[in-house]
């Protein structure tokens, strides 16, 4: 059974709303979104010590699942390259007095934002749906569902593959034997959040393209005509996101993004 707020929206969808009606409904939406976000933020803040040890700092340890997969692949196919056999561990240091507290706060904030994304999309859908025609409602609902799923797939790929590869490369990169690499807590968290969220946003390509097609700015012929250009752009973006420079990392990041780019044409046709 829909909530009273949702019922009010759908009861009024057959008559034209005034500017103040829209503003009042938007205010309710913002309050609900902020309420859900606040609950997640408090929960993450309380659980942050455990999350740091078992999730956020997991890529620092040699037993992280992706490193185990690399070693298994190397052992199975008799690959002796250091990429597959490297033993890896990173110890972070803190050089700012207040850094642990602010990192605690900011990490809880961003985790709560990511977790609340499905609910935010749901509220967006519920707010705009009364103004749409039935066929537009079906399209927007499908696009928001796809966008939510793809965002979390991108976040998972960033966490389990892209960031560990980047961390392992940059933390072991040696400019001079006289320079010892010591990674600060702030540097680790900044790069962690940036890469994971960038992968999530990169996976929103189908949703963005669908919205552009809805506005008549992108067409099937355009996507097919500039397919090769898109591949070059994807490789460049992958190189920026993962500054490791090795072909393997560029490949594992570029392939999913390219497949998404190809799927956009299909999504454009069937949505």
Outline where the language-model segments fall:
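Extracellular interaction modules
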Residues: 1-6
